[in-house]
């Protein structure tokens, strides 16, 4: 298939620039693969469409304030986006500067803090901080909003560009399907008899990388670290043995589960994955998916297309556009069953 097969015309005013006042105020478009029927609801109603014994798998990765601003000794401005923390003091980052940096160069930040460039690794730079990097980011870092949100980060983003159940620091982009869940929704889901389990996948900046190949099969996915625990594997096995559904909350949770089951059986693991899911992929674990509405020609639209069918995906997105759903990270959600 070609990249153009996944194009749709999205009015710019449907790209959400801010979150709604309340997380669960977002709209929910439900699509049933068996009946091919749509339903339009509020996200706070989602428990009504889940069944006792269903297993929701959520990504508990926490967004770090990964964007830093500094300057070189010459005064030239430097902007960093931390891609991956590799140690207490070391990390890999994308760096923007007027002139490319090299080993041993220093980057000066506010409050007397500084970074040292250790080496270049392909498109990234391995750097060392003058103190614990997570502490430094919490002091000076900015929330790294996606490129399609055309504004600077604000104080509200520290709370709202984060799921309420985020626990494991490491993502530079939010697992956005989880942004709709608040405590009341989670309580209603548990009261319904639905089980919840967690996976961790640290979302990298590569999630926004466009597909540049005409043939989608030629696209090379970015790599992200994930972990699937023995407890999660046991929960999935228990749900499947009872004939219950495993529903991924977000494409990151889905990609983690499918990566851990590449041999045909879900096994505990902690490693990198660059799994690329597009039409023709045979799903091994997931029976349902909760996800936002994604960019035209993106790998995430290709994943949705693989899950519900290509024509069905394009029709679903046209339905969302016609009904004025909000798109992308701060937008509305879909439940695909």
Curated annotation (Swiss-Prot):
Which InterPro entries does its entry note? QueA (IPR003699), QueA_dom1 (IPR042118), QueA_dom2 (IPR042119), QueA_sf (IPR036100)
Domain of life assignment: Bacteria
> Which UniProt keywords are present, listed alphabetically?
Cytoplasm, Queuosine biosynthesis, S-adenosyl-L-methionine, Transferase
Keyword Phosphoprotein listed? The answer is no
| The protein's Enzyme Commission number | 2.4.99.17
Show the catalytic activity.
7-aminomethyl-7-carbaguanosine(34) in tRNA + S-adenosyl-L-methionine = epoxyqueuosine(34) in tRNA + adenine + L-methionine + 2 H(+)
**Location of this chain's protein in the cell:** Cytoplasm
MF term (GO), any = S-adenosylmethionine:tRNA ribosyltransferase-isomerase activity
Transmembrane annotation, as ranges: none
Cysteine pairs forming cystine bridges in this chain are: none
Name the GO cellular-component terms.
cytoplasm
Pathway noted in the entry: tRNA modification; tRNA-queuosine biosynthesis
Predominant subcellular localization, coarse grouping: cytoplasm
The subunit field of the Swiss-Prot or TrEMBL record says:
Monomer.
What the entry lists under PANTHER family is as follows: S-ADENOSYLMETHIONINE:TRNA RIBOSYLTRANSFERASE-ISOMERASE
UniProt protein name: S-adenosylmethionine:tRNA ribosyltransferase-isomerase
Source organism: Legionella pneumophila (strain Paris)
């Amino acid at each position: 298939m070609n990249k153009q097969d996944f194009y749709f015309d999205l009015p710019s005013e449907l790209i959400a620039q801010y979150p709604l006042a309340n997380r669960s105020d977002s709209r929910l478009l439900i699509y049933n693969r068996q009946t091919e029927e749509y339903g339009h609801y509020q996200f706070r109603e989602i428990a009504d469409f889940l069944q006792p014994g269903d297993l929701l798998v959520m990504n508990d990765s926490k967004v770090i304030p990964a964007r830093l601003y500094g300057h070189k000794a010459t005064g030239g401005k430097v902007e960093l986006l931390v891609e991956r923390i590799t140690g207490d003091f070391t990390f890999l980052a994308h760096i923007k500067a007027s002139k490319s940096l090299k080993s041993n160069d220093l980057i000066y930040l506010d409050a007397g803090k500084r970074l040292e460039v250790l080496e270049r690794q392909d498109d990234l730079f391995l750097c060392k901080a003058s103190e614990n990097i997570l502490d430094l980011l919490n002091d000076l870092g900015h929330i790294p909003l996606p490129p399609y949100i055309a504004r600077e980060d604000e104080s509200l983003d520290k709370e709202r560009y984060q799921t309420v159940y985020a626990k494991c620091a490491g993502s530079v982009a939010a697992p956005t399907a989880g942004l709709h869940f608040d405590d009341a929704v989670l309580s209603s889901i548990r009261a319904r008899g639905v089980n919840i389990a967690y996976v961790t996948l640290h979302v990298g900046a590569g999630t926004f990388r466009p597909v540049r190949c005409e043939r989608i099969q030629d696209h090379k996915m970015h790599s992200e670290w994930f972990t699937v625990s023995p407890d999660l594997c046991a929960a999935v096995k228990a749900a499947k043995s009872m004939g219950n559904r495993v529903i991924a909350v977000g494409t990151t949770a889905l990609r983690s589960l499918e990566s851990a089951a590449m041999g045909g059986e879900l096994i505990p693991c902690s490693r990198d994955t660059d799994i690329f899911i597009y039409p023709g992929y045979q799903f091994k674990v997931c029976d349902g998916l909760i996800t936002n509405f994604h960019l035209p020609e993106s790998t995430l639209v290709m994943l949705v297309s693989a899950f519900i069918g290509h024509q069905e995906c394009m029709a679903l997105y046209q339905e969302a556009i016609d009904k004025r759903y909000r798109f992308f990270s701060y937008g509305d959600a879909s439940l695909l069953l």
